[in-house]
Amino acid sequence: MVNVLFQYTHLTKADPQLIVYIEYKKRGDFIMRIALINENSQAAKNEMIYASLKKVAESKGHTVDNYGMYSADDKAQLTYVQNGILAAILLNSGAADFVVTGCGTGEGAMLALNSFPGVLCGHVVDPSDAYMFMQINDGNAIALPFAKGFGWGAELNLTYIFEKLFEGEPGGGYPKERVVPEQRNKKILDGVR
């Protein structure tokens, strides 16, 4: 398979004007290093979340690093605020291009991550949230609710969310007739942050 290298401005660094080189496969998928970070209230679900994320991400050529918590019994009991700090360090250092995290509702994790420079985190509940967040907002992190509404079929919903999250090139705009205004709005947001 022929790989093409080109320049792509993306929010994976503290300076959004920094040009980051991302390898694109011929079929158009871009390659990311994805970090999974779980906090203490939902740590017991880490293995299931990781398996679902890894299955989808690797099928698209991405890699996934699991930063834990790995179980509810881990000695290090991470809060979503600590996860926000870790996410900011990973994203701003270039150790990760994207972060998947969450908490009981996903709200606290989203707020914590968005408290740090260089992080643009969306709250994602379903596959359409995932798709529109990546197409419209082109962020570098998502926070999921791992307790609220997380019952029967939760692993299926996770798989569908990850499939839509990593579908195609981010920042393409949605709906298609709104691509130009959406991309303009994103640049304004980047300038404010």
Model-derived regions, located:
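Short, Lys/Arg-enriched N-terminal segments with co-localized hydrophobic residues
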Residues: H10-I31
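N-terminal beta1-alpha1 ligand-phosphate binding loop
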Residues: R33-L53
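C-terminal binding/interaction regions
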Residues: Q42-A44, Y131-R193
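A short beta-strand-loop structural module common to alpha/beta enzyme folds
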Residues: G61-K75
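Short, structured active-site "lid" loops
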Residues: Y80-F98
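A short, small-residue-rich loop immediately preceding and capping a beta-strand
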Residues: A96-G102, C121
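Short Gly/Thr/Asp-enriched flexible loops that form oxyanion-binding sites at enzyme active sites
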Residues: G108-C121, V125-D126
